[in-house]
């Protein structure tokens, strides 16, 4: 009799686990199609809004990737949602919103208290890579570190140069970005621009780098 009870308990636990997994799958399905009512109902039923999918993305990250604007706004505003939750690639929702040119979502994330700065790649790197001057300026207004270094010491200015985004380079230089920095691949911002085939931008960046070095001579 006791053994039979254990079997029933095990079956019940399996059923609960399967139901939870199915509900989590339902959450991500609703997120991807921007089904706000469905997402709200699932969260109200107790589904964790911070749960990750099989790829390691949270519901908020999936919403941003899927351009599910209504769901993304709902999740950003939800008090239980972690606005800084990273995925397996260590990307935050703000980084992805910046890369996808979603100024509106970046603004919402900042208002929600999401971190503008973090170690490694940052939202400013992603905005510079996307060539979005508005987001770059917004992040700088909220104290984004202008010379933030990726794990291999690549800066936002280098990413802007890599994408041949002249307007972003100009904005970063105007705000004081250091064009003389070199990453671990021995590339400066000018070097990135040259590799991208934009000699005019490379010359501009090298000129600025020379001026920077003259103003900031090495301490001996």
Spell out what each predicted region is:
Residues 4, 19-45, 54-57, 73, ...:
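Intrinsically disordered, low-complexity regulatory segments in ankyrin-centric signaling systems
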Residues 29-34, 62-68, 96-102, 126-132, ...:
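Ankyrin repeat A-helix N-terminal signature
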Residues 37-38, 70-71, 104-105, 134-135, ...:
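Conserved ankyrin/ankyrin-like repeat signature
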Residues 43-48, 73-82, 107-114, 137-145, ...:
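Ankyrin repeat domain, specifically the short helix-to-loop turn at the C-terminus of the second helix
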Residues 20-26, 142, 175-178, 184-220:
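Ankyrin-repeat-protein effector appendages
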Residues 7-17:
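Bacterial N-terminal signal peptides
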Residues 51-52, 83-86, 115-119, 146-149, ...:
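Ankyrin repeat boundary signal
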């Amino acid at each position: 009799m006791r053994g039979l009870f254990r079997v029933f308990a095990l079956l019940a636990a399996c059923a609960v686990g399967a139901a939870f997994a199915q509900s989590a799958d339902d959450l991500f399905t609703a997120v991807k199609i921007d089904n706000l009512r469905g997402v709200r109902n699932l969260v109200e039923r107790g589904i964790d809004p911070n749960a990750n999918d099989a790829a390691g993305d949270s519901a908020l990250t999936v919403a941003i990737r899927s351009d599910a604007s209504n769901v993304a706004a709902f999740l950003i505003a939800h008090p239980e949602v972690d606005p800084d939750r990273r995925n397996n690639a260590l990307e935050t929702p703000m980084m992805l919103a910046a890369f996808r040119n979603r100024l509106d979502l970046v603004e919402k994330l900042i208002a929600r208290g999401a971190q503008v700065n973090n170690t490694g790649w940052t939202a400013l790197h992603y905005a510079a890579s996307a060539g979005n001057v508005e987001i770059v300026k917004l992040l700088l207004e909220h104290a984004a570190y202008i010379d933030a270094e990726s794990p291999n010491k690549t800066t936002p200015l280098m990413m802007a140069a890599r994408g041949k985004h002249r307007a972003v380079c100009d904005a970063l230089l105007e705000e004081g970005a250091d064009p003389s920095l070199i990453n671990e691949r021995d590339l400066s911002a000018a070097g990135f621009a040259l590799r991208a085939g934009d000699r005019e931008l490379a010359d501009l960046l090298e000129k600025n780098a020379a001026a920077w070095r003259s103003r900031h001579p090495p301490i001996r």
